[in-house]
Amino acid sequence: LLFIVILIIYIFTANTDVTYTDNGELAAACAMLGIAHPTGYPLFTLLGHLWSLIPFGFSKIYSLNLFAAILTALSSIVLFYTSLMILSNAKFRNKQIIEGSQKRKRHIDISYQNLDLSSFSQIIISLIIALTYGLAQTIWEQANSLEVYSLQLLLMNLVIFFVLKAYFSHSKKYYFITAFCLGLTMSNHLTGILLVPAILWLY
């Protein structure tokens, strides 16, 4: 439902023609399987080319702009599930000062307790987070016309989701999925490298 709502909004605001910045160049690269300006964005070009082969019945530039809208809407869904996972595993620190006897000084007892939120509350909070993200100006702009950042938003959200999944579940398979998604992110846009320090700090 969240995906449908956000996607409908994106479709109504999507550009029907070539717009500013690299939109025309990237659309041409996707349609003709060409090479865009460095770094070339190979993953984006390949996926965009496959999408452009689908006979929608309207112009390729409009269909590619809708492709960006779908990718951005999908990133909102990933963020929704990431928020759900964080809220269901969140803990808060409880600090208590314990007074000691004459021979023993007082000390601080620190414990961690689960954030006691109902499933309904977790869903509502996650919905608000995802909608705020999806309708923020910077994110919304990526959904209106074809740009590499729409795919990058999806991939970076997937990296964050799986790295947290690996952290909470301690399952090796999610480490490998995280590495795979990070590689895909790098093959699309080099801003993916900004996630590496956060991943290293987490582990």
Indicate residue ranges for each PLM-predicted region.
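Membrane-interface transmembrane helices that cradle and orient dolichyl/undecaprenyl
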Residues: F120, A143, M156-Y175, L182, ...
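Perimembrane helix-loop-helix junctions
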Residues: L195-Y203
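Extracytoplasmic catalytic/substrate-binding loops of multi-pass membrane glycan-assembly enzymes
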Residues: A14-L26, A36-L47
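Membrane-interface alpha helices of multi-pass inner-membrane proteins
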Residues: A29-M32, I129-L131, Y175-N188
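Transmembrane signal-anchor helices characteristic of membrane glycosylation enzymes that use polyprenol
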Residues: L1-Y20, Y133-L135, H189
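Transmembrane-helix motifs of polytopic, lipid-linked glycan transferases
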Residues: L66-N114, L155-K165
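Aromatic- and kink-enriched transmembrane "portal" helix at the membrane-lumen/periplasm boundary
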Residues: T13, I54-I61, N65, I98-S119, ...
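Membrane-water interface at transmembrane helix exits
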Residues: I9, A14, G48, S52, ...
